[in-house]
Amino acid sequence: MNLKEWLLFSDAVFFAQGTLAWSPSNSYTPANVSCDEDINLIRQASGPSDNETEWLKKRDVYTREALRSFLDRATSNFSDSSLVSQLFSNASDIPRIAVACSGGGYRAMLSGAGMLAAMDNRTDGANEHGLGGLLQSTTYLAGLSGGNWLVGTLAWNNWTSVQDIVNNMTEDDSIWDISNSIINPGGFMIVTTIKRWDHISDAVEGKQDAGFNVSLTDIWGRALSYNFFPSLYRGGVAYTWSTLRDVEVFQNGEMPFPISVADGRYPGTQIIDLNATVFEFNPFEMGSWDPTLNAFTDVKYLGTKVSNGEPVNKGQCVAGYDNTGFIMGTSSSLFNQFLLQINSTSLPSFIKNLVTGFLDDLSEDEDDIAIYAPNPFKDTSYIQDNFSKSISESDYLYLVDGGEDNQNIPLVPLVQDERNVDVIFALDNSADTDYYWPDGASLVSTYERQFSSQGLNMSFPYVPDKRTFVNLGLADKPSFFGCDAQNLTDLNYIPPLVVYIPNARHSYNSNTSTFKLSYTDDERLKMIKNGFEAATRGNLTDDSSFMGCVACAVMRRKQQSLNATLPEECSTCFTNYCWNGTIDDTPVSGLDNSDFDPTAASSAYSAYNTESYSSSSATGSKKNGAGLPATPTSFTSILTLLTAIAGFL
């Protein structure tokens, strides 16, 4: 069944049955459902869930075959490829792969799409000129903010391919049709825009009328969904995150395990720092490995009022709260950054006053971010000793964009020792520099986190400072970190090897603004094409041995644990691609401009609203994902604000 047939079938099932794993209300509004009277929805984060563990057994069947094929092809010119056979002689010695897709708005979604396409054997030319089959060999696929839009789009559209999306780009209701701004989706067709926002308003107001707290992220997530699920009724208004459990391609383990990342915001605060609790959403659960929570809950029953995991009303749960768009919006919600900086922007005064007024009202109720209420972790007993209990004591759970702690690549869920990942491909489409290219800042932040209180139970390989990243060219092309496990023994455990793939110019200036909210068909294709080239060293033209080097990185952890002989070609690869510990901290101008720097956000917002960006633009603003003006708490007045803002976009 192809993508279009599946989408039509899914919509038909939705209207015919209504329930299944979709929202039981057939709408955006959560609803009460029956559940076991003795059910407990929370567990300690002592390892993967039973559901994930059982799923991994199915996935391993597919990755084993795909990885063997990839490694055989990649090492076909090696003088000695016996290591591949040695690894596959025992199931426990087969490497486990993860891919992490960074944030960065549509830039990250499109460039990241090209990078994933380079790893996907369903992409035209990926086997001949790329890393085709690597994605089929991958167990975990994590996304954050714009990277989560990419992961969520592929996973929740029946594991479609980037190639299929590209092939259908000119069709009606095509995925990622962002020719018009998300704020003005109808373009010159004003009626279309008004109708869209009327539907969004109705959906969110329905949730509010049912007694659930709503926030700007509800609106943002609903608006985004029309771009990701255009063939589903009203952008999948009743499509839930847990629906994926019942989709055959996931049930059978034919696709990677998708993970979305968001940050927790402590009650009564606005600033997000490196000690923020990192949350993950997967098809079975949401929660955190961090000691400040150390727990997971069943994502299907979010919205249920609980005490330490037990429903307050025995035998009664809530379902439909885990709307797919809401969770994808949560990972890209940046409204609190504007709350900090809106007054310093150069917006026209009447719009600034309008926006600031709404933001002030929202701030008082802390509705400027994603709010999960009732708190699914209320009274949880799994928080580790000597850590704040503020999350469990609050009636609400507050979540924000997963990169606001400066970890713009979702690495934390993938480096957990219990998941046994051997290598992580870190796709970095951040806008860290003045010219909106990455500079390794995300890797630096995750490395530093392991030495903070939140990093009590994690490890990450050594990486250099940002200046060294730039001075040594580590942010211009793929680089490997943690190549020698013998140098990592002083960490909590041996972490995965990290293959860092940064956004870089090959055939197109892909350093576009995160606030660029519309792309023409041509721009989309060029962004995707450039991403493919960034992941493949220019279609393997810059280095014809790169695929073999990727194979070496994949095998490295298991090769060292077995004390097996390293092919001489791998030694050459590691000399060329592994960071060898050299530091060059010569001052570099234009760094420290993170996607999530609130000061940069204000100037970025101003620039976006006063400049016109063309397809050849090599500049842009530096703020991630959900950089939209605040929306009024009175949903009936939403169009007033949107119409005013649309005139400046």
Curated annotation (Swiss-Prot):
Q: Can the keyword Glycoprotein be found in this entry's annotation?
A: yes
Look up the EC number in the record and give it.
3.1.1.5
Q: What is this protein called?
A: Lysophospholipase
Gene Ontology terms describing biological process: glycerophospholipid catabolic process
In which compartments does the protein localize? Secreted
SUPFAM superfamilies named in the record: FabD/lysophospholipase-like
Q: By its UniProt entry, which CDD domains does this protein fall under? A: cPLA2_Fungal_PLB
Q: Which residues form the signal peptide?
A: 1-21
Domain (PLA2c): give its ranges.
Answer: 34-584
Which terms does the record give in the GO molecular function aspect? lysophospholipase activity; phospholipase A2 activity
* Pfam families tied to this protein: PLA2_B (PF01735)
State the family it belongs to.
Answer: Belongs to the lysophospholipase family.
Q: What class of enzyme is it?
A: hydrolase
Keyword annotations from UniProtKB, A to Z: Glycoprotein, Hydrolase, Lipid degradation, Lipid metabolism, Secreted, Signal
Major localization class: secreted
Q: Which InterPro entries match?
A: Acyl_Trfase/lysoPLipase (IPR016035), LysoPLipase_cat_dom (IPR002642)
Q: Does the keyword Transferase apply?
A: no
Please explain the role this protein plays, according to its UniProt record. Catalyzes the release of fatty acids from lysophospholipids.
The record lists the catalysed reaction(s) as: a 1-acyl-sn-glycero-3-phosphocholine + H2O = sn-glycerol 3-phosphocholine + a fatty acid + H(+)
Residues modified by glycosylation:
32, 51, 77, 90, 121, 158, 168, 213, 275, 343, 386, 457, 487, 511, 539, 563, 580
Tell me a GO cellular component.
Answer: cytosol
